[in-house]
Amino acid sequence: MSKTLLDQIKQANPIITNVANSVTVDQVANVQNIIGASPIMSSDPEEAPEMVAIAQALSINIGTLSTEPIHQMKTLMAEAYRQAKPVVIDPVAVSSIHYRQKIIDELLALGTPQIIRGNAGEIAYLAGLDWQANGIDAGSGEIDLVKVAQTAAKKQQTTILLSGPTDIITDGHHTTKVANGTPLFQVHVGSGDMLTGLCAAFVAVSPDNPYQAAIDAATTFAVAGQLVAEAMPTPLPGSFYPQLLDCLFNITAADVQTHAQVTEVLTHE
């Protein structure tokens, strides 16, 4: 990973404005705060200009939709693009529900986010590829996941983080795989949302290189989860989350570099 981004977060304490999934709002706030960022949750469009002005990045999660949050998302995103602040989007369950597809299409029409983080099914929708999704879960498909991520990145003209047992990060021209992690991520509701929150923290200190920010966020999170699981006598989901927070609080860039299983994928244009 980049040697400096994690340290930069701890030094700069970037403010992250979040429209969060109500199911995981505390998890996202905790993970951002623990690595050194300063999370703010926003729900009223009246505060959008100031919320964006004080922030170094905006994170949008469509996990729990209703009319007011949708209006807030659109208002904040429009303001973030006006103020040239980086935006991260998490298109939760977009592959399964037509209404969510309509909303994400409207959000993406406002401008181009720096990073989109999703599972295989969600990213396949953004790529325009067929995939059998299963609600918020990734589901299954026959298409190579690297191709899914690269196609989505080119179509949306952004950095894609396709998270799963192996994370795939691509801007459509360069692609990286992160093989660290643990199966406990798949049984903990909120793992993806936390990773999205980390992407916002990393891109806040690397707005001109969202691809590297996404790699560093994914690697940090995956290594932390792996270290926790390996240290547990019996890896269990109930005790995994608090220990994950402790690990993220203590982890250093050197720790991540020591354990990272990161490979670059050769891309044929």
From Swiss-Prot:
<dbReference type="GO" id="GO:0005524">
    <property type="term" value="F:ATP binding"/>
</dbReference>
<feature type="binding site">
    <location>
        <position position="41"/>
    </location>
    <ligand>
        <name>substrate</name>
    </ligand>
</feature>
<feature type="binding site">
    <location>
        <position position="163"/>
    </location>
    <ligand>
        <name>ATP</name>
    </ligand>
</feature>
<protein>
    <recommendedName>
        <fullName>Hydroxyethylthiazole kinase</fullName>
        <ecNumber>2.7.1.50</ecNumber>
    </recommendedName>
</protein>
<dbReference type="GO" id="GO:0004417">
    <property type="term" value="F:hydroxyethylthiazole kinase activity"/>
</dbReference>
<keyword id="KW-0418">Kinase</keyword>
<keyword id="KW-0460">Magnesium</keyword>
<feature type="binding site">
    <location>
        <position position="117"/>
    </location>
    <ligand>
        <name>ATP</name>
    </ligand>
</feature>
<keyword id="KW-0547">Nucleotide-binding</keyword>
<dbReference type="Pfam" id="PF02110">
    <property type="entry name" value="HK"/>
</dbReference>
<keyword id="KW-0479">Metal-binding</keyword>
<feature type="binding site">
    <location>
        <position position="190"/>
    </location>
    <ligand>
        <name>substrate</name>
    </ligand>
</feature>
<comment type="similarity">
    <text>Belongs to the Thz kinase family.</text>
</comment>
<comment type="pathway">
    <text>Cofactor biosynthesis; thiamine diphosphate biosynthesis; 4-methyl-5-(2-phosphoethyl)-thiazole from 5-(2-hydroxyethyl)-4-methylthiazole: step 1/1.</text>
</comment>
<keyword id="KW-0067">ATP-binding</keyword>
<keyword id="KW-0784">Thiamine biosynthesis</keyword>
<dbReference type="GO" id="GO:0000287">
    <property type="term" value="F:magnesium ion binding"/>
</dbReference>
<comment type="function">
    <text>Catalyzes the phosphorylation of the hydroxyl group of 4-methyl-5-beta-hydroxyethylthiazole (THZ).</text>
</comment>
<dbReference type="GO" id="GO:0009228">
    <property type="term" value="P:thiamine biosynthetic process"/>
</dbReference>
<dbReference type="InterPro" id="IPR029056">
    <property type="entry name" value="Ribokinase-like"/>
</dbReference>
<dbReference type="GO" id="GO:0009229">
    <property type="term" value="P:thiamine diphosphate biosynthetic process"/>
</dbReference>
<keyword id="KW-0808">Transferase</keyword>
<dbReference type="InterPro" id="IPR000417">
    <property type="entry name" value="Hyethyz_kinase"/>
</dbReference>
